[in-house]
Amino acid sequence: MLAALLGCVALLLVASVGAIALADRRLATTAIYGVALTASVAGLLLALAALLAPAPVPATLALPIGLPWLGAHFRLDALSAFFLVVANLGGAAASLYGLGYGRHEEAPARVLPFFPAFLAAMNLVLVADDAFSFLFSWEFMSLTSWALVMAHHRRSGNAAAGYLYLLMASFGTLALILAFGLLAGWSGAYDFAAIRTASPSALMGAAVLALALAGAGSKAGVVPLHVWLPLAHPAAPSHVSALMSGVMTKVAVYGFVRITFDLVGAPLWWWGALVALTGGITAVMGVLHALMEHDLKRLLAYHTVENIGIIFIGLGLALAFSANEMPAAAALALTAALFHVFNHSVFKSLLFFGAGAVLTATGERDMERLGGLIHRMPRTAFLFLVGSAAISALPPFNGFVSEWLTFQAILLSPALPQWLLKFLVPAIGALLALSAALAAACFVKAFGVTFLGRARSQVAREALETDRCSLGAMFTLAALCLVAGVLPAWFIDALAPVAQALTGSHLPERHGLDWLTIVPIAQSRSSYNGLLLFVLIAFAAALAAAAIHRFASDRVRRAPAWDCGFPDPSPATQYTAGSFSQPIRRVFGTVVFRAREEVEMPAPGATQSARLHVQLRDVLWDTLYVPAARAVALAADHLNAVQFLTIRAYLTLVFGALVALLAVLAIWQ
């Protein structure tokens, strides 16, 4: 099975090379996305088989490629199988979407060669079983995604977004190189099998955890390493944005889980506190920034930050429970985090596909220039509404279940022995609740301003529904949002081998009909029946519709409800995206955004319009990145003098560096 998965990867790489040779645009689009769809579906089926029917011993494969003394090692276990399901499901949906969306692509020659290579790179990361193969695949993933971000580099701001992403990706890779270097130095080998058998010291483990959090967190979008997401995601084509947000960030989560739960060994309790607190801050900061956005794709990018924070809350709780030898609670927290990995991959891809359909139909990402699209694009509007409900954690959709499971894990915090965790975990729960409420408010704004009301521009009035392939991909993901929310037990059962392997336990047996009800700990505490809730919601909706039909007047008359003296008010008088975010901006603006509002009022009696100017700044960008950039520029100016030294001075520098290196090696030994 592992060899077959690598065969799918090889097929994707062949398609990547073949895209360069195909000159006809339409043929190339159909062929490349068709091959990518075929390979992704095959990889999805193989990964599902490995996850649902796990082998007694994980499959391994060693190939004589890469470093001569190491080769390339690959491994397929329950953890990699689950993430392969996520990666190939997202790849299949993006490939199907690309069959239609790709026909409108402005620069297919800069997208088609790198799209299948990007899919192949993510698959390789998930099956790599040695440090060199992992890092090579990780960097391959970074470079192919960077090339896709730079596909439209001539547009304003896209080149800067691409270079910032490359900088953050390089920082993350450097951190992972150091992490694997420490693990390899301790174990004496680079393959993961040898690293697993060596138990690092507490200090070494803490250093590896910090480096893994920095390396994987920069790719996932953990605050304060999130700054590239709101720039790179809008710059990339929409189906690539869906892959980067829905899949690539999950590959980063996989890297963190693989290192901290599998390779490092037994955790310490404060590791969980650090990771969970980082997740809570990430969730709140992400959703606050999303609320301020008017750009639809930037808004979705910030919500990726929020949901990555939710995932890291679950991972942090799992580490804390594992350190305190509470395997059942650790399994619950880990299951919640991994289920949210799957859920976010599904509904975030759906939302980016919807944003791409709007962008294709109107050429606009600014919500202030949209509106009324539900009349022109009813199917896209309905599917975007499903994704909005799912990401807002509304039942009966999948986002509710994984966040509910996370809250159930938080409610177990009184059993933790450390007094700091007894206070910290409920505070993190409050941050999670705040982020969930703000997410719902944000998507009321996103859906309402984009699809409801009246069109605010001519392009919105003339928009047309998107193509069938794009709609097919969106309908598939929308159906998964509903199925995973109504029947979550099927998906939770599939995660049992992963939780068992990493925590030594899995969720307890559920009460009654296990395909109907999930019970995280005990029925007396809490349980959830998605199917029953769905039936009740459907019955209530049908009852309300019947009552309206029975008692409403049969006479239909279309007229303005009340024009308040204005015969035909402009669409500009509607509620705007800025109007929705103003209350939140005034509460958090000074601290989080350094917000400034300026009002230009015309003179008394003048007929000019008043103008409101709002300036928002990212505090983390101004506090961390701007000073760092200035320091680097200053250091570069001073080091510029090194270019003009004599040969004697250069030899002196080389000799000094050699002496310093030998001294470090002597101290290390």
Regions found by a protein language model. Give the residues of each.
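Hydrophobic core segments of alpha-helical transmembrane domains in multi-pass membrane transport
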Residues: A15-S16, A42-L44, G90, F180, ...
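Hydrophobic alpha-helical membrane-insertion segments
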Residues: V35-L51, G172-L178, F384-P396, A473-A496
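Hydrophobic alpha-helical transmembrane segments
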Residues: H73-A87, A202-A216, L420-A436, L513-A541
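Membrane-interface helix-loop-helix modules in multi-pass inner-membrane proteins
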Residues: P58-L84, A131-V149, A216, V401
